[in-house]
């Protein structure tokens, strides 16, 4: 009986350790977050590259490996009715941090011209299958690029506060499962925007640096 109890305890500990290990993996290739109440103020996205694919030995300014570990973070913004309203790509180097404004960069020039009050933003980290990634031009529509780990992102959004007004919250993007069907859909629809949108639906690329929460418009 004692041996049986010890085995059960050991098994339970192993399962807890395994689940904790899985929970700690946050830099998955595909991540999702929603942004709400956009007419009341800006929502912000901060993105970094954890270095999961390597990093320059002597830093980004010197050496033959100065482009090691770079990833493309491909951005897809969806309106509440499932329409892809904008897409774009950002080159993110290891240990760098870049930002996007949802109003400023993702919804200011949508494909349809309609500016939604809330969006779902999906991020997909990719890189070339061989060699270093030095450009992310049109990578959001490129099915040949390989999804990779190394992406971590946070976002702020506005929630109605008790007593009126809005409160700003910041949370990490949620790691998500990327099916082949979803990958083909978002990349194919982005390709249609790039090819036929006459510049509309192409969101502005990331800017260097992290941004804190901004005040809402009451």
Segment roles from a protein language model:
Residues 1-23:
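Sec-dependent, cleavable N-terminal signal peptides
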Residues 19-218:
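Gly/Pro-rich, tryptophan- and cysteine-flecked surface segments typical
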């Amino acid at each position: 009986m004692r041996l049986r109890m010890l085995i059960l305890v050991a098994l339970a500990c192993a399962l807890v350790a395994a689940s904790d290990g899985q929970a700690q993996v946050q830099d998955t290739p595909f991540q999702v977050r929603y942004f709400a109440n956009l007419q009341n103020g800006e929502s912000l996205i901060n993105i970094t590259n954890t270095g999961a694919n390597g990093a320059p030995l002597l830093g980004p300014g010197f050496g033959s490996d100065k482009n090691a570990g770079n990833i493309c973070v491909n951005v897809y913004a969806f309106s509440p009715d499932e329409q892809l309203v904008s897409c774009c790509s950002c080159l993110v180097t290891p240990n760098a941090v870049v930002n996007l404004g949802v109003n400023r960069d993702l919804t200011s020039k949508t494909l349809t011209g309609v500016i939604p009050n809330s969006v779902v933003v999906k991020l997909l980290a990719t890189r070339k299958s061989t060699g270093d990634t030095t450009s992310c031009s049109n990578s959001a529509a490129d099915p040949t690029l390989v999804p990779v780990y190394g992406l971590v992102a946070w976002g702020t959004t506005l929630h109605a506060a008790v007593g009126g007004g809005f409160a700003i919250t910041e949370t990490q993007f949620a790691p998500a499962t990327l099916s082949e069907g979803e990958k083909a859909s978002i990349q194919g629809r982005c390709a249609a925007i790039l090819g036929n949108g006459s510049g509309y639906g192409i969101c502005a690329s990331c800017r260097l640096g992290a941004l804190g929460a901004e005040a809402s418009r009451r």
